[in-house]
């Protein structure tokens, strides 16, 4: 069957759900797709909760691990929606997920109010540069007391303000479950939530004019056709039959040609900044490429191993380290989609760095990473995020 072409008629916005485990992120995502499919059937299809929640581990522990992508349209926009993991163990995915958002819907259960992971996700959203957050106050059908709801709203606004988000952001009262069940009143609230997204999440400033760059998130082999790499285009545009380079992580760059571009199971002639897509690469084997590398316009970018960065070290309360670190500290530096070990050199006169400190540091990575000034990274020890920073200067 020939694949339908993806139409580029409306502004395209990447959005996602974040928040504490069991507050209803995935149910909210499912409710949005259902309500929009009912309201604009010619534009949308509904995704069932189970389809969004389809990570195998998910079934055993009731925690979202993999990132699910769904798409939907309002009258004004086309949205690609990631359902971001809600459990502290899966912050690694949260980082890759949150990095793909032009705005986020923070789901907070009115029955609980903000919880530790609510705070953690807002902090992470700030670190990885999610520009705007609005709030879906979920499970409102279960709270009769207006005062409780007002109290929760105040707490949420304080939390947003703490991380420099808009404390006057819309807080929409929803019941995702009731909306999924077809309750008209609550379906109306989901439409109000989407109206709030249309009105408040700014049209993303796309980086279309810069040379092409796409970090590799995943790699697949398609029998008889070759190797496909998937990811979100960070910059530039790409046409079918363009030559590209794959750089970073490995010693040598790999040259190849893009023989096909796919988005949401539809074929495209081109891809541009902001698109989540798959690139079919000529003559490339599965083992020639790995997550963490980037696909770029030939000659436009170079991988580096030494840089200076400005870093915020998470406090103990934020889930960071409990003890200071010293010169020659060797954590993992998380760039875009992967961890690379690096050795930290502290500035002269700085003997140690305490949790909660800001510090400028020089870093030498054990593998090269395609970077330029302003690129954000997280510092991690195993699965725990202990710092967040941005590259301030390339040394080598």
Curated annotation (Swiss-Prot):
Residues 138-141 are annotated as: G4. Pfam families: GTP_EFTU, GTP_EFTU_D2, GTP_EFTU_D3. Residues 19-26 are annotated as: G1. PROSITE patterns: G_TR_1 (PS00301), G_TR_2 (PS51722). It comes from the Bacteria. Residues 83-86 are annotated as: G3. It is found in: Cytoplasm. GTP binds at residues 19-26, 83-87, 138-141. It catalyses: GTP + H2O = GDP + phosphate + H(+). Residues 62-66 are annotated as: G2. Keywords: Cytoplasm, Elongation factor, GTP-binding, Hydrolase, Magnesium, Metal-binding, Nucleotide-binding, Protein biosynthesis. Its EC number is 3.6.5.3. Mg(2+) binds at residue 26. Its main location: cytoplasm. InterPro entries: EF-Tu_GTP-bd (IPR041709), EF-Tu_GTPase (IPR050055), EFTu-like_2 (IPR004161), EFTU_2 (IPR033720), G_TR_CS (IPR031157), P-loop_NTPase (IPR027417), Small_GTP-bd (IPR005225), T_Tr_GTP-bd_dom (IPR000795). Residues 175-177 are annotated as: G5. Residues 10-205 form the tr-type G domain. It is an enzyme of class 3 (hydrolase). One of its GO terms (cellular component) is cytosol. Monomer. GTP hydrolase that promotes the GTP-dependent binding of aminoacyl-tRNA to the A-site of ribosomes during protein biosynthesis. Belongs to the TRAFAC class translation factor GTPase superfamily. Classic translation factor GTPase family. EF-Tu/EF-1A subfamily. HAMAP family: EF_Tu_B. This is Elongation factor Tu. The lineage of its organism: Bacteria, Bacillati, Actinomycetota, Actinomycetes, Mycobacteriales.
